């Protein structure tokens, strides 16, 4: 994994060095840049050495002809196979790196190279002969790629903070996207929370030539029609998962794994527990003192049981509730505000793991492809109930509204209450009810009038247009399509990349191997949700291979006890933040509504913990990116990468 940056049509070697060094955390091992006055282009690269650790694999990298120069972030897991193909076609190699395979692959296949890649990547190639830039982002959006127009040219990078080194005004907030953040806790691509900064969507290509930019989609999340669905045998699925997982062990450094003790991460470990050298396992623990009001099972107990069964050592990290010291730094590395409380867990775990490994495998993505979230089974199951039962369910929920202390509810009861509140709506609106932090009417009351006028008419529309694209598919297929198109890349993968790369650790997600995603998309609904059992076929594939307790265990993930944090350790800090002059003078929110959110949460009238957390993250974001000038990058020496001598 690395950090890439570039300027086309507005190139300045001093600026591209600053852009590159703004991402030194993404690549502390090495750095390089290249500048071509004739083509008015500059490229920069920070390297985290994982495959072929020698300096010969440094970037920017040139092909043997001197025509193409590449900067690349990611891993190509099938690079050895591609290398053999290219050698058979007459290509020679100076290194053992996947970078050179990608470079020669582009030289041979051109734009079609993306269809040959099995990996996670974002890259850009400059063609010196045709004088155009070609860039691409991987199919699922595992690696980031942001860009902006600047003067008469074009800027791109792995992180937005690099772009600010070229143009400080790009860091201005895009307040017209504020309601997206309040609704979803993230901003949907291609939009961002920064003024005039865009995100290249997953599975897209970008070209820049003669001052003109164009983008095109080369891959989309599969959305098969009902008659295209094909059942899968449990053993066949296990083989696919095992193949995807073992293929991602390729590295010249130690590999580790995030283990929650849940089905997904335990399944990965089962596939590679006999690997040589052994993988290193990391898990999080919160302790009994943080469980009040957050009824969940301690992940570490299950993770420890799995590690013992597989005879592997495990490293446990206690996540303390004292998070105020880390939060500003995490927000800085995220670039955009993300209101998922797991940002703290992921950041601390990768920081701890960084002393022992540069690569971590994660079970992320399994929920989105196998239907693992409560909203999947809730929305799906309600479709089988008559309308009068759904309406009655909703009516009962309105009668008991406010009768119970929300703070005392378990997560399952909270979800049941949420389901009942939306039971009388159509499937799409039920799904959205499970997918948002603030409802649209809450946003309208929360924002000051001068902001409501510049917001999108309805934040749901970004989901609705994709939902309507799937009219020939089953309801469950359409819901999974939405999650894979938006929730997965815009929140989970963004969170995963930024928090891990902040600590110079590469995160790999085997469940999102393209071949696995495409095959699982074609599995019938009843193999994903069987009765009320989620991820049914994955459980069947792992049955007898991992402990029964894990097969039967309900989903928990790495979710931290945010309700406990908000009511206890963060309470005084929250008071200081929301009563501060900076927060009250932002001119964003009706302060009476903010006060009511907090009071209702404290009194148990409503569970507003996640909403309060979202407002806290947003204020910390303002303090990092608005109140302070952009952080100056470290002045690290970069090597000038010259073309090969011909």
What does each of the following model-derived ranges do?
Residues 14, 232, 236, 240, ...:
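Generic recognition of stable, solvent-exposed alpha-helical segments in well-folded globular domains
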Residues 1-4, 165, 169, 196-201, ...:
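Adenosyl-5′-phosphate
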Residues 160, 382-383, 387, 539-540:
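Acceptor-binding helix/loop patch of EC 2.4 sugar-transfer enzymes
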Residues 1-328, 332-334, 346, 350, ...:
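Cysteine-centered catalytic environments shared across enzyme families
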Residues 331-333, 374-381, 631-633:
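Short secondary-structure boundary/capping segments
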Residues 33, 144-147, 267-270, 369, ...:
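Generic hydrophobic alpha-helical membrane-span motif
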Residues 139, 290, 348-407, 474, ...:
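Active-site adenylate/phosphate-handling loop in enzymes that bind or generate adenylated species
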Residues 336-338:
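Acceptor-substrate binding/catalytic loop of class I
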